[in-house]
Amino acid sequence: MNLPPLTPATLIRRYKRFLADCALASGEIITVHCPNSGSMRSCAEPGQPILISQSGNPKRKLPWTWELYWSGASWVCINTQHPNAVVAEAIAAGDIPALQNYAQLRREVPYGSHERVDVLLSSEGRPPCYVEVKSCTLLEEDGVIRFPDAVSSRALRHLGALTEVVRGGGRAVMLFLIGREDGRGFAPADAIDPAYGKALRRARTDGVEILAYRTRLSPDKISLSVAEPLLF
């Protein structure tokens, strides 16, 4: 997916989950919207370069949005609204072998108990395929990318909903999209959210398919890269 025009800045601090202060090249300090509810461990170090986009909506309280963070080795996707679009675009292009040959792709379709699946794939004569996408940015000291970066009851609930899809005769896929180019492999963050790690393993045993893919990032574009090994 193509990114909007981006402006360089330097991160000063991220606070109250959805706010960040940064300095523009001119020296002006502004507050930007941070579209990420996680802890953002390993991708919110003050003093690092970031890229921000400006909204054309005059009604927005904060016209700027934090899009990318420079880790020192890779750009990191901060905006959690992008992964779903990247995955949907890749599926439509046939770039994910496990999700090829479906006639219809729909996004944000209601299912389960008050849930909305990120992507629903369907074809006549085949069980529907429910795909949940999780954005992963946490890089641990061992070089492994992990999820979640904070305890997440919502992510846990999604695993339960996918398991129910399988029990009902459908196909369910949990796809972890790694929003950075450094690190290797994927595993659940057991030290941060042990309940999620246990639930992910249980869901896999119950028939939920687990995929992990890396992204290719630049100041202009985010696209699907290669599949990553599951290290659990």
Curated annotation (Swiss-Prot):
A molecular function (GO) term: DNA binding
One Pfam family named in its UniProt record: SfsA
Disulfide bonding pattern of the chain: none
Coiled-coil blocks: none
InterPro entries the record matches: SfsA, SfsA_C, SfsA_N
Superkingdom per UniProt: Bacteria
CDD domains xrefs: SfsA-like_bacterial
HAMAP family named among the record's database cross-references: SfsA
Family the UniProt entry places it in: Belongs to the SfsA family.
NCBIfam families: sfsA
Protein's UniProt name: Sugar fermentation stimulation protein homolog
Gene expressing this chain: sfsA
